[in-house]
Amino acid sequence: MLIGSHVSMSGKKMLQGSAEEAHKYGESTFMIYTGAPQNTRRKNIEDLNIEKGQQAMKTYGLSNIVVHAPYIINIANTTKPEVFNLGVDFLQKEIERTQALGAKDIVLHPGAHVGAGVDKGIQKIIEGLNEVLTHDNDVRIALETMAGKGTEVGRSFEEIAQIIDGVTHNDRLSVCFDTCHTHDAGYNVKEDFDGVLEKFDSIIGVDRIKVVHVNDSKNLRGAQKDRHENIGFGHIGFDALNYVVHHDTFKNIPKILETPYVGEDKKNKKPPYKLEIDMLKSQKFDPELKNKILTQ
């Protein structure tokens, strides 16, 4: 099963450290940010320790890794040209880093229209992607399904389809299907996942899905909040998420957990990924999971 989580990439080890962390959690794939998601400070490609990282990946049987673009990129911004231009320039550099790391997809939040309206936001996203996707490489931008918080674009399959349809080189666009976001946007992931997939297929095409973010939700369906919960402890529930993870459609697609660290003490929170992945592999919910994470 191709399953992993978000892991860190930092210090001198960089990609090698990411591979070691993923191996510690029993993963077969993983997702990384090339630096802090909240800023544009990045190391040079030659400082990412790629060769040793890829050797470690081979040793540990890790493949199909995914890069996530930082949150600060907002190519839907119609009011501040400097924000749009920063997003376009930085996204292009992130694509170069993604290619150097050997990843095929970089996940991107489509952006927020900051009050100009969805249609104007979508047109701006299309403009930005058309600038970025003229360069010659084979990295795909995976547009993430969003929860609809604030002025986010991409809360419906139709909005994502509109973006894809408007982009010239849209063979370089894929989709990252996030279970929490889709649930929070109002789709019935919990009780009718096949129905949700059928709708997605009719509007976008399931062959576009190249990454799945596997997250439970702290919120009721349709809340448009985007607050992740540990697997089985939220409003989607273990059975539905287990069904998603083992779905034939996603057999060869990286499934990435972005569930919250566990613990009340902010300085001593524990990563949940090893035990969550073990639980999904066994296909049996463990109500004591959070306590076990704290004592591991």
Swiss-Prot record:
Its cofactor is Zn(2+). The keyword Nuclease applies. The keyword Zinc applies. Transmembrane segments: none annotated. Keywords: DNA damage, DNA repair, Endonuclease, Hydrolase, Metal-binding, Nuclease, Zinc. Pfam families: AP_endonuc_2. GO terms for molecular function: deoxyribonuclease IV (phage-T4-induced) activity; DNA binding; DNA-(apurinic or apyrimidinic site) endonuclease activity; phosphoric diester hydrolase activity; zinc ion binding. Zn(2+) 3 binds at residues 181, 226, 228. This is Probable endonuclease 4. Endonuclease IV plays a role in DNA repair. It cleaves phosphodiester bonds at apurinic or apyrimidinic (AP) sites, generating a 3'-hydroxyl group and a 5'-terminal sugar phosphate.
